[in-house]
Each structure stands twice: as C-alpha cells, then as structure tokens.
C-alpha cells in the first residue's frame, strides 16, 4: 500500500465523506432527501450527523417525496442527493426522469440488494445496473458510476458530484450491501490535492438574451440560474422545451433535437474520464473480462 496516514473506514462513512467533500469542492451545500431502506439507511444516519459540515438531511414520508425534495434543492442552488436500494429506486424513476428533463444536478445512490421485489434485503447483489442505465421512460440517458470498495466510495462520490454539476445531469452512484457495510484501510487524502471545480451561477449581468437552456459549447450543459435572480426569471419542468427559447414546445423536429442534445451531453462525459486500464494480464491478450463494482477484480 502507498505510504501515508490510514484509518479503517466503512463504506457508508466513505460515501458520506466523499459527498461532503464533493459538495465543498464545487462550492455547494449538500441536501439529502431520503427514506429508510436496507441497506441504504446507514448513509442517511451518517449524513444526519454532519450538520457541522453544512449538510441538510430530510427523512421524507416516502421515496417519491425524498427524490423530489432533492430535485427541489438543486433547483434552488444546492446539491441535491437521494439514496435508496433497488425497490426504492423503482419508485423514484419518474422523478429522476424529471431531473433529466429539467437538466438539474442530482446524485442518486443505490445500495443494491438481492431482488426482485422485496427480495433478500440483507443480502448483497449487483443486479441493478440495467435499472440505472435504462430504468426510465423514453430517452433519458444518465451517467452511471460504481464504487469498487468501501474506500473507493469516497473518490467515486466526489466524481459523481463533479460530473453532476459540470454537466447538469442526474448521476447514478452504485454500491451494494457489501460495500456500504464492509470496512477496509483508507488512505486519508491530501485535501489540497482534490479537484476543485466551483459552480458558476448566472447573475443579473447575464440577463440580456437569457433563457434557462442556453448551453456551454464544450459540455452542452445548460446554464444554472438561481430562482429570484433579477432579470433571470424562468420556468423549467417535465414538458419538452424549445431549443432556442426554453419555452414549452410540441414540435417534433425540436423534440428530436432536444433528445439528441441530451444524449450528446452524456456521451461527451466519456472524454472527461480516464481510460480504463487492464488490472490483470496484458493488453495483448485475446479475451477481455470486464468487472465492475465490488466484483471488479
């Protein structure tokens, strides 16, 4: 192991520290909207004890309220986060589609367990990958990340926050019952070495020609304007928007254009992440076996 100061860390703690660090690195307050479910409840418990780091936690009456709370927090200028396991994610899918449509940053944590339905709540399983990638109506692309170990959850959480805010998109972060409950040595990082990418909100100086779906030429992310900013009054929602004005549109050609730009935005994230390296064997070998999450090795 590399030299440095280590401590034993549980996956839930690493996730919480990573989310708090990620929010701090982009200059946002963290708001968690969650509803208890095994094995994801431990993250809610840990973050609820982090008020001194500017964390707000809201235990909602159900999964739908929890994710909608997180979306509302992001609309208001915070980092919205929601957490659950497979059955709860199933209930959140319509609201996650709303976050795709409104193009708001949202980090969605799924601590996977055995299914289907109630399944085996206390047993681990990596069975929600397709749910994360495809589990919404229509064309609703989102990036999906997976932690490979309890310690790796810290770095993966920071990366999820970075991508969500840079590209104005919901991001799935997959763990499982093993990762969130297991413990391992964690190399405490040098905070000064962590990547800082502060969010820049639109200001009153940007009012001329403003609409909420103006886009960055490189990332295709839309602009982020806080409600109540003078001259930046706007509306966003689940109805399709006109590409050139942000107004509601039922035009089929415009819908195709918006569908393709949302897809291109997510596809472009591939240019912003490191290329994957061979863990065992050689790049010259004939067969590649791809692992991910807690079985990546």
Name each region found by the language model.
Residues 115-117, 152-153, 180-183:
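Short, well-ordered, mixed-charge alpha-helical segments that flank or form enzyme active sites
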Residues 1-18, 22-26, 156, 161-297:
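Flexible, low-complexity linker and terminal segments
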